[in-house]
UniProtKB/Swiss-Prot annotation:
The modification Omega-N-methylarginine is found at residues 216, 512, 529. Interacts via its LIM domains with various PKC isoforms. Interacts via its PDZ domain with the ACTN2 C-terminal region. Interacts with MYOZ1, MYOZ2 and MYOZ3. Pfam families: DUF4749, LIM, PDZ. It comes from Mus musculus. Expressed primarily in adult heart and skeletal muscle, and detected at lower levels in lung. Isoforms are expressed in a tissue-specific manner. Isoform 1, isoform 3 and isoform 5 are expressed in heart, whereas isoform 2, isoform 4 and isoform 6 are expressed in skeletal muscle. This is LIM domain-binding protein 3.
């Protein structure tokens, strides 16, 4: 559906275009500035611009469309077409308001700023619905971070403080049941993201209780309990090697399993031990019983301080107790502690929130160096490798039937008056190519030359002409030459066996133009594309060049063009076959064309007058122009090869651009170019070296100055009379 819009000027109009003829896509509105004139005129993004001020945009390039819009006088009239693409519909799903789980360590009473315990308060939703029981231990609001108090407790008696013995006893008795816990009293601000109590025994116990409650809620089939999230069944690949190893380990005898559990209970995880057993390295770094006993001894640590800034845990927090004990200086214990740290870091993020590679790097000890574990990478041996078998050289020659087959000089001697044909080419194990001697040509009293279209070439009896590699001519391919050598030669398979090294030298002479008669003459300079040329006629003489079209000897008058010689009847236009002997021609794409065909198929189009360019072409702004069409917008003079500037879509010569658009210094009247230091004062622009006192010529940059008759003066000459 087309519609017209008229925007009231002046610009800016508030929309952006894309596309054009040079981009092979229609002009489209790609962006509309909110609140602009285009937005107020109900323009839509993606609409096609059909016409600008009544001019169709089908033949406009992107730059031409921009210039057309810029040249709009006061109002801009646009004819547009609605885009056929549907308006994109948002596919974003609405947010699901679901309760978020409480981080267990944030449920502990936090220290307030004055050192007292900060106690949470029950939510108003719990008071409003006394019949609803919610699991405060499992989930609560992420904004209030409070648990819900039981309505029975709220109605029967006062709420006990968190630190009282009765509250502790009641909370311990309610851990195994579904009843909610007793909550503290009035609400106070709490601290969040506090790492205190993250790894305490109470936190781990609460996490286990949450998991058991979610399992019971799933097994009951009555829906989710207390806003708990569903637990998905894990997809187990029973064909994986790790799963088979786990099943095999679970089916071991009880005594072996107990021994396995005893060894892996204190040091490494079960998965890491299974992998160690599969690779055969489970006994590489086993500690002795002394290390097991010492590792179970509790170690006193320094108190943990809290900070407002979140900082990563120190590497010491991931060390085992054995590594922190003073007796851990022995090589064996250092190896055990490093192994424990490596296992803890490999077990996953549940074992340690920060994986630090430094404990592994410091785990080197003489015991570990004496019996290193086998590396998973490929071992490198310093010994000499086994000698590789000596490669055999096999050169395969690609034999193709060709019209031009060189013949050794010894096997080719044409006699006058006899027909001859080239000898069939027979490959040999190592043929040597010997060029024939220089051609000798003896003209007869009446030489005749008649080219025949037949494949067999029969020379006239008079001339004794011997072909050379540079100007060799042979007849059409014979039947034996056109067939592959493995058909015509019975010994081909023995000659070119894979075990033999064969080198075949072959030369294929392609038809090309005859070289210049005088090799020491001046070289032909390359001409510009689209330059008109004329062929030069030469009379018949003792000179016998080769034709650039048929590659035959020219006997009689000939033409010279593009550095080659031609038969007059064969130098024709490549398209219309018009003779180019006496007319101008243009060389294009390795062919010659007359003026009419060149204008029709190859001549560029001027960007201003939209006509064919048959003479000198000007290339500018990614377009082609007549030299008389690409001129300065001010003085209307052609640029030639000189510099020009673009301003508002129009080209200007350097002189007019400086006079019209450049900023000039008020002191020296020269333009202030890019990179020059300048000063703006007294309503003008100055070079930093031109802003001086009009009397004493002292530089006034950064100094207080006075003005008189629009001239700067220093403080000393501020009251000068003659300025």
């Amino acid at each position: 559906m087309s519609y017209s819009v008229t925007l009231t000027g002046p610009g800016p109009w508030g929309f952006r275009l894309q596309g054009g003829k040079d981009f092979n896509m229609p002009l489209t509105i790609s962006r509309i500035t909110p609140g602009s004139k285009a937005a107020q005129s109900q323009l839509s993004q993606g609409d096609l611009v059909v016409a600008i001020d009544g001019v169709n945009t089908d033949t406009m390039t992107h730059l031409e469309a921009q210039n057309k819009i810029k040249s709009a006088s006061y109002n801009l009239s646009l004819t547009l077409q609605k885009s056929k693409r549907p308006i994109p519909i948002s596919t974003t799903a609405p947010p699901i308001q679901s309760p978020l789980p409480v981080i267990p360590h944030q449920k502990d009473p936090a220290l307030d700023t004055n050192g007292s315990l900060a106690t949470p308060s029950p939510s108003p939703e719990a008071r409003a619905s006394p019949g609803a029981l919610e699991f405060g231990d499992t989930f609560s609001s992420s904004f209030s971070q409070t648990s819900v108090c039981s309505p029975l407790m709220e109605a029967s008696g006062p709420v006990l403080p968190l630190g009282s013995p009765v509250a502790k006893a009641s909370s311990e008795g309610a851990q195994g049941s579904v009843s909610p816990k007793v909550l503290p009293g009035p609400s106070q601000p709490r601290q969040y993201n506090n790492p205190i109590g993250l790894y305490s025994a109470e936190t781990l116990r609460e996490m286990a209780q949450m998991y058991q409650m979610s399992l019971r809620g799933k097994a009951s089939g009555a829906g989710l309990l207390g806003g708990s999230l569903p637990v998905k069944d894990l997809a187990v690949d029973s064909a994986s090697p790790v799963y088979q190893a786990v099943i095999k380990t679970q089916s071991k005898p009880e005594d072996e399993a107990d021994e396995w559990a005893r060894r892996s209970s204190n040091l490494q995880s079960r998965s890491f031990r299974i992998l160690a057993q599969m690779t055969g390295t489970e006994y590489m770094q086993d500690p002795d019983e002394e290390a097991l006993r010492r590792s179970s001894t509790p170690i006193e640590h320094a108190p943990v301080c809290t900070s407002q800034a979140t900082s990563p845990l120190l590497p010491a927090s991931a060390q085992s107790p054995a590594a922190a004990s003073p007796i851990a200086a022995s090589p064996t214990l250092a190896t055990a502690a490093a192994t424990h740290a490596a296992a803890a870091s490999a077990a996953g993020p549940a074992a340690s929130p920060v994986e630090n590679p430094r404990p592994q790097a410091s785990a080197y000890s003489p015991a570990a160096a004496a019996s290193p574990a086998p590396s998973a990478h490929t071992s490198y041996s310093e010994g000499p490798a086994a000698p590789a078998p000596k490669p055999r050289v096999v050169t395969t020659a690609s034999i193709r039937p060709s019209v031009y087959q060189p013949v050794p000089a010894s096997s080719y001697s044409p006699s006058p008056g006899a027909n001859y044909s080239p000898t069939p080419y027979t490959p040999s194990p190592a043929p040597a190519y010997t060029p024939s001697p220089a051609p000798t040509y003896t003209p007869s009293p009446a030489p005749t030359y008649s080219p025949s279209p037949a494949p067999a070439y029969t020379p006239s009896p008079a001339p004794n002409y011997t072909p050379t590699p540079s100007a060799a001519y042979s007849g059409g391919p014979s039947e034996s030459a056109s067939r592959p050598p493995w058909v015509t030669d019975d010994s081909f398979s023995q000659k070119f066996a894979p075990g033999k090294s064969t080198t075949t030298v072959s030369k294929q002479t392609l038809p090309r133009g005859a070289p210049a008669y005088n090799p020491t003459g001046p070289q032909v300079t390359p001409l510009a594309r689209g330059t008109f040329q004329r062929a030069e006629r030469f009379p018949a003489s003792s000179r016998t060049p080769l034709c650039g079209h048929c590659n035959n000897v020219i006997r009689g008058p000939f033409l010279v063009a593009m550095g080659r010689s031609w038969h007059p009847e064969e130098f024709n236009c490549a398209y219309c076959k018009t003779s180019l002997a006496d007319v101008c021609f243009v060389e294009e794409q390795n062919n010659v064309y007359c003026e009419r065909c060149y204008e029709q198929f190859f001549a560029p189009i001027c960007a201003k007058c939209n006509t064919k360019i048959m003479g000198e072409v000007m290339h500018a702004l990614r377009q082609t122009w007549h030299t008389t069409c690409f001129v300065c917008a001010a003085c209307k003079k052609p640029f030639g090869n000189s510099l020009f500037h673009m301003e508002d879509g129009e080209p200007y010569c350097e002189k007019d651009y400086i006079n019209l658009f450049s900023t000039k210094c008020h002191g020296c009247d020269f333009p202030v170019e890019a990179g020059d230091k300048f000063i703006e004062a007294l309503g003008h622009t100055w070079h930093d070296t031109c802003f001086i006192c009009a009397v004493c010529h002292v530089n006034l940059e950064g100094q207080p100055f006075y003005s008189k008759k629009d001239k700067p003066l220093c403080k000393k000459h501020a009251h000068a009379i003659n300025v």
